[in-house]
Regions:
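Short, low-complexity Pro/Thr/Gly
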Residues: 176-382, 387-390
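C-terminal domain/tail detector
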Residues: 28, 360-613
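Short linear motifs embedded in intrinsically disordered, proline/glycine-rich low-complexity segments
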Residues: 51-60, 66-79, 84-100, 114, ...
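Extracellular ectodomain segments of secreted/surface proteins
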Residues: 41, 53-60, 78, 153-164, ...
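Generic structural motif
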Residues: 148-158, 227-232, 286, 463, ...
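Generic hydrophobic, helix-prone segments enriched in Leu/Val/Ile
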Residues: 48-49, 70-72, 153, 202-210, ...
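Extended assembly-interface regions of large multimeric machines
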Residues: 1-220
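Mixed-charge (acidic/basic) macromolecular-recognition segments
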Residues: 1-24, 29, 36, 228-277, ...
Length: 613
């Protein structure tokens, strides 16, 4: 039952029970109040009064969203935004046409096929609404850069011995390819194996156990002692969601880990020596050496490592229906599309502009556009208290009563929250630039449905989605969760001293767990596996200078996890998140101990991101 519907049901039940008591005292009213099938007009009046009193009760118990929403929008706006559907896009280069590496940049727009008969196949008599929704193409934006090269992976094989681990990755290139046409530093692997155990174990071995590598082509051997694998997803250029500059990346990493952990199974090859001119590139093997054998039960296949893959997210720019403010309303409905309301949802309001009516011909075209400032920003102008002149726009949201998600509106206010008069608008027509999603439609797509380019697409490659888009997630509207989030953002050293406090902070960021009971149960089991937490100050030398930082040790029970690799991935995410708790010019280092095997992993020191002022 929806949060708002609960109040209505409780108030209606209270009125009906009260009606039965009143009918006992006044029997002549029993026909109207006590009987279930009584007077329909009285029933409608009771339902209307229950709706009004339920709305009033909800307002009294809503935990002051006027305060929490404004504060969260300035500190971490993505918590109040929906998490769109996400998927992985794989490109298939035409190796005979590629002469040099071709880059496909992030923010490239792609879409699904417009005609989707499978969307209405389950209904015997689909109505016109279903036909409209099925004809809307879902637009996705590439989240990361990708380089296309005339290379393919033929096979991935576990060649481990009793002393060391070995993985052989066999490549093939076009017969006309030369070493000058290839750049191995631009290779990105995606651990696309459907076996979660294998991909998590590979993640652990790639990050912790890699010693060196070599290229093998027949009798030709080229040592690569400096090669290493960089885990993707932690740098700001790897962000899936649009991220405000004033928000620390640790929040982003934690949110993306809970909402789409698939984005962290990408690795970049780094520090690979250039290929010699006489190296045979038509068929060669990259051999990775590890300091211990790989587990015997991992299953390596041809698709265990995939090339030319990148995450994509269901976000795109769109313009809202025009708004003409007149100063008579406190807020105005903000709709992405009046024609297709169930096909578009607002993720973010980017800019608000209007055309200024200028008399004469001396003004330049650029001066005819008015850019309205945002109310929840750090760009308020200095004004005298009784001479408010600047008008700001304010994006407001509330839970929708008619569909999943939020209802959006836009208000125009002065800095003190007062509503400006009609003379401030001059009959302006407001144009609102949005970043939108396609609501629930992407969740109905299947593998291979996203395969159409919108703008420019390399003529030397085709693409398609190789994973089914995830289910969109709506923001949590519970006021208690908002206050918990604000408390979690109050970064201090004490948060790393108590186990229960840390677990509560992590649960606050678990948006899938707030929507799916099964995901919440699994997440709770994994967080409860943190048996002990210890944080203490430490001193280490950096370039000969002693620097004081924080060292945190976690003791984790491995039972709820798939394998040790899943624990290691969680630790990698936490090492970036804990850097928020160390001040600038300081650092934080994390250590995790497996309580069963007593194996320990320690991450490199992360420089502090918590400003002192």
């Amino acid at each position: 039952m929806a949060f708002e519907e609960r109040y209505y049901r409780e108030e209606l039940d209270y009125l009906r029970q009260l009606g039965k008591l009143l009918a006992q005292e006044k029997p002549h009213l029993a026909h109207f109040l006590a009987e279930k099938e009584g007077d329909p007009d009285v029933e409608r009046l009771m339902e209307a009064f229950a709706f009004m009193s339920g709305s009033l009760r909800q307002k009294l118990e809503d935990e002051f969203p006027e305060f929490t929403h404004g504060l969260i929008r300035m500190l971490w706006a993505n918590y109040l935004r929906p998490v769109p559907a996400m998927t992985v896009i794989a490109y298939e280069p035409k190796t005979d046409q590629l002469k040099v590496p071709v880059q496909v940049c992030r923010n490239e727009l792609i879409r699904s096929r417009s005609e989707k008969s499978s969307l209405t196949a389950q209904k015997v008599l689909p109505d016109n609404h279903d036909k409209i929704v099925s004809s809307v193409a879902c637009h996705f934006t590439l989240a990361r850069d990708i380089w296309l090269q005339p290379l393919r992976i033929l096979d991935t094989r576990n060649a481990s011995s009793l002393k060391e681990g070995i993985i052989d990755i066999s490549f093939t290139a076009d017969n006309n390819a030369s070493p000058a046409m290839l750049d191995l530093n631009k290779i990105t692997f995606w651990l696309g194996n459907e076996d979660d155990y294998t991909r998590h174990q590979l993640y652990l071995w790639f990050c912790e156990c890699l010693m060196d590598a070599e290229l093998i082509a027949g009798e030709y051997r080229l040592p690569l002692p400096d090669l290493w694998l960089e885990a993707a997803g932690f740098d700001n250029r790897d962000a899936l969601l649009p991220w405000p500059k004033n928000v620390h990346s640790g929040y982003r990493v934690l949110q993306e880990y809970f909402c789409y952990p698939e984005a962290f199974f990408f690795f970049h090859l780094r520090d690979v020596a250039p290929l010699p001119d006489d190296f045979p590139v038509s068929a060669f093997t990259l051999r990775l050496h590890f300091n211990r054998p790989l587990p015997a039960d991992i299953k390596l296949r041809q698709d265990s490592l995939r090339l030319h893959c990148t995450p994509a997210i269901n976000l795109f720019t769109h313009y809202a229906d025009p708004v003409r403010p007149d100063g008579r309303m406190a807020e105005y409905p903000l709709r992405a599309s009046h024609k297709h309301p169930d096909a578009y949802d607002i993720f973010q309001v980017s800019t608000v502009t209007s055309k200024i009516k200028v008399s004469g011909t001396d003004s330049s075209p650029g001066s005819q556009v008015r850019v309205w400032p945002e109310f929840e920003s750090f760009q308020h102008q200095m004004e005298y208290s009784r001479q408010r002149e600047v008008v700001y726009w304010h994006h407001r949201t509330k839970t929708s009563l008619f569909h999943y998600g939020l209802e959006h509106s836009i208000a125009f206010v002065h800095a003190d929250g007062s509503i400006p008069g009609s003379s401030r608008f001059n009959d302006d027509v407001i144009t609102t630039s949005l970043i939108c999603t396609n609501r629930m439609i992407p969740a109905r797509l299947h593998t291979g449905d996203i395969c159409v380019a919108v703008n420019k697409n390399p003529a030397v490659a085709s693409f398609r989605n190789v994973t089914r888009p995830t289910q969109p997630l709506w923001p949590v509207t519970d006021g208690d969760m908002h206050w918990s989030l604000i408390s979690a953002m109050n970064l201090n050293y004490l948060s790393l001293l108590d186990r229960e406090t840390l677990i509560q902070i992590l649960r606050t960021f678990d948006l899938p767990g707030a929507h799916h009971p099964q995901r919440a149960r699994l997440s709770r089991q994994k967080l409860d596996a943190i048996e002990k937490l210890e944080t203490k100050p430490v001193d280490r030398l950096f370039k000969g200078v002693p620097v004081r930082g924080l060292a945190t040790t976690l003791w984790i029970r491995p039972d709820p996890f798939i394998c040790e690799g899943e624990i290691y991935l969680l630790g990698t995410v936490l090492s970036h998140f804990f850097a928020l708790y160390a001040s600038i010019n300081s650092y934080h280092c994390l250590k995790i101990i497996n309580t069963e095997s007593q194996e320990a992993w320690e991450w490199q020191e992360k420089m502090g991101q918590h400003a002192l002022i």
